[in-house]
């Protein structure tokens, strides 16, 4: 099959800012693979015939999970689950990671606690967020910081942008789940990025915004400038991880069986 596309979800709830970073990073990273990066909405994933046959990777970027659920719950998530199990790859970043978990709890900016179940359940446990006690907001960058990460396969200090993402509770207790990175500066160093082989497919869920490219960030809020500088100076481990990650995601099993 001719699988030469990366689909990036772009519908209600997706942050335009993080969508731009996601698409820019994917276009750079996927260039050697000669794959097209396409933005798609929920109706496409629900109704477009046979998109699975030409798609190597589906990316659900940052934003707000609840609108994702409203649009994709049912037929959309069923097709995504089948796509992955039949050999596809799924990358969920921040809200896309919450969306890929069986359960999550999220402290909303107004102080209310959202506890919810989700269809995909790629991570079978609970995702909790925001992982850091920062002033998260859906409408500003007030909660942005540089998260200190410790990668399983890449030693050394590294930072990634954080803005409301989760940690994966007791991820090490699930034998089918691999912890790819931990929050180095949180109590107990909980899992920040996890992966899982699901039948013939591959899932990667990331609490922090690993797609963020500091050289393309012009925001001038003090906390964002500080985070950007930290990430730019301490990104060797993150960059190594991202290079390996994209190869894994784009080199996964390419044969899909559609029923």
Curated annotation (Swiss-Prot):
InterPro entries: Biotin-prot_ligase_N, Class_I_gatase-like, UCP016642
Pfam families assigned to the protein according to its UniProt record, in alphabetical order: BPL_N
Domain of life: Bacteria
Family from the record: Belongs to the chlamydial CPn_0128/CT_035/TC_0305 family.
Protein name: Uncharacterized protein TC_0305
